[in-house]
């Protein structure tokens, strides 16, 4: 009975991809890969399984979100929870040279366990890039501009990119709060976009009215270059001023790339990915309640693999991207040749000729069809090769 109960069920958070959605994913994948390669990035693949002690702990994904298992030697493994940490491992061990910035790309599924069924997948596909070895703001501008180019190539014309700097947030919190423990509480409110909770917590802190106002003013630091001047007035530390200057340089570069119209500053932007060290960003689209992609600078991650190097990159969620584009049946037009046994050779010859021309063709024996009317609805056209030659129907 228990076996029958789960006959059609899937593990928590897992999804099937039906033909029409698979075809749409394939087209999005192909289009984006072509654009990424035009920018000089090279694709890489990494194992689905990684060691927990290395990639698992470096990934910045909460431990309870990891799928863990043991190999036959007793080592703890994880299904990769993201692609940045595995690529950092490969780059640090086999590819990266100090004098040579590295441009890598990926298209892979990642895995994050769900505690309950809330509509979020435990396995999802990401497409993204990593630019390793370039610590300049120009590298951040490049990956953001590439991300915008990819979205436009797949037909997403309306999107917005929120850009912030984790160094700025950390500098402001350290100035006012004095320790990491108190700062982490406020960062969590910001990550969860719980601005009501943030305001209430700030008002409960034993701070002067001036410092409370500084923390509350952080939420209003949004928009264009004018927000940078307001941000600089809010902090006094060198780290905070430098972070604001980096954002100013980023906006100038993005204007040159022609994507500044889609970019808006959000100085309160915080990520759950703890390895981000500088500029970070999220991209949003209409009709989608979550970011369809995110990225940022992670200058300390490769040091965990004993090869310090600056790096930046992004990942786009394919499922959310397709939701933003709008699901449409993009299966190519398929033709079907229905044949009887005596016309088999003729049917095979016709199918091979059409396939050689790039057409998609199905060969189907007439006796294998239960309902010819229902079956024919699946195809653009039907060619019938039935009976003796000379008695075709279409």
From Swiss-Prot:
Query: What PROSITE patterns does the database record attribute to this sequence?
Result: AA_TRNA_LIGASE_II
UniProt KW keywords:
Amino-acid biosynthesis, Cytoplasm, Histidine biosynthesis
Q: Which GO terms describe its biological process?
A: histidyl-tRNA aminoacylation; L-histidine biosynthetic process
A cellular component term (GO) from this record?
cytoplasm
Stored CDD domains: HisRS-like_core
Q: Where in the cell is it found?
A: Cytoplasm
**Keyword Amino-acid biosynthesis on entry:** yes
Main location group: cytoplasm
Pathway membership, UniProt? Amino-acid biosynthesis; L-histidine biosynthesis; L-histidine from 5-phospho-alpha-D-ribose 1-diphosphate: step 1/9
What Pfam families does the record point to?
A: HisZ-like (PF21996), tRNA-synt_His (PF13393)
Q: Does the keyword Cytoplasm apply?
A: yes
A single Gene Ontology molecular function, please? transferase activity
| Signal sequence range | none
Tell me how this protein assembles. Answer: Heteromultimer composed of HisG and HisZ subunits.
Family recorded in the similarity comment: Belongs to the class-II aminoacyl-tRNA synthetase family. HisZ subfamily.
Q: What does this protein do?
A: Required for the first step of histidine biosynthesis. May allow the feedback regulation of ATP phosphoribosyltransferase activity by histidine.
What else the UniProt entry mentions is:
This function is generally fulfilled by the C-terminal part of HisG, which is missing in some bacteria such as this one.
Name assigned to this protein? ATP phosphoribosyltransferase regulatory subunit
Lineage of the source organism?
Bacteria, Bacillati, Bacillota, Bacilli, Bacillales
| Gene name of this polypeptide | hisZ
């Amino acid at each position: 009975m228990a076996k029958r109960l789960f006959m059609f069920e899937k593990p928590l958070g897992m999804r099937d991809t039906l033909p029409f959605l698979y075809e749409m994913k394939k087209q999005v994948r192909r289009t984006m890969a072509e654009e990424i390669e035009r920018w000089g990035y090279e694709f890489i693949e990494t194992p689905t399984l990684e060691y927990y002690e290395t990639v698992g702990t470096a990934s910045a994904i909460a431990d309870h979100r990891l799928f863990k298992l043991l190999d036959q030697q007793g080592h703890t493994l994880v299904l990769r929870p993201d692609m940045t940490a595995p690529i950092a491992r490969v780059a640090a061990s086999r590819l990266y040279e100090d004098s040579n910035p590295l441009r890598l790309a990926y298209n892979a599924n990642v895995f994050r366990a769900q505690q309950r069924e809330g509509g979020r997948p435990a396995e999802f596909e990401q497409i993204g890039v990593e630019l390793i070895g370039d610590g300049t703001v120009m590298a951040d501008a490049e990956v953001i501009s590439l991300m915008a180019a990819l979205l436009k190539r797949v037909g997403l014309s309306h999107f917005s990119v929120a850009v912030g700097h984790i160094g700025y947030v950390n500098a402001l919190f350290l100035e006012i709060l004095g320790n990491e423990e108190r700062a982490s509480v406020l960062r969590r409110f910001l990550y969860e976009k719980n601005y009501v909770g943030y305001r209430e917590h700030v008002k409960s802190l034993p701070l002067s009215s001036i410092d409370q106002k500084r923390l509350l003013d952080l939420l209003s630091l949004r928009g264009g270059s004018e927000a940078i001047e307001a941000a600089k007035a809010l902090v006094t530390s060198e780290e905070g001023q430098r972070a604001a200057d980096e954002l100013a340089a980023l906006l100038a570069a993005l204007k040159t790339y022609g994507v500044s119209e889609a970019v808006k500053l959000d100085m309160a932007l915080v990520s759950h990915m703890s390895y981000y060290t500088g500029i970070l960003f999220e991209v949003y689209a209409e009709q989608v309640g979550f970011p369809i992609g995110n990225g940022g600078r992670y200058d300390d991650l490769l040091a965990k693999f004993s090869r310090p190097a600056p790096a930046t990159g992004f990942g786009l969620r394919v499922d959310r991207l397709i939701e933003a584009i709008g699901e449409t049946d993009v299966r190519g037009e398929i033709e079907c040749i229905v044949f009887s046994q005596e016309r088999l050779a003729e049917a095979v010859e016709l199918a091979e000729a059409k396939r050689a021309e790039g057409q998609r063709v199905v060969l189907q024996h007439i006796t294998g069809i239960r309902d010819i009317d229902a079956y024919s609805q699946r195809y653009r056209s039907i060619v019938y090769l039935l009976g003796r030659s000379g008695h075709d129907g279409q």
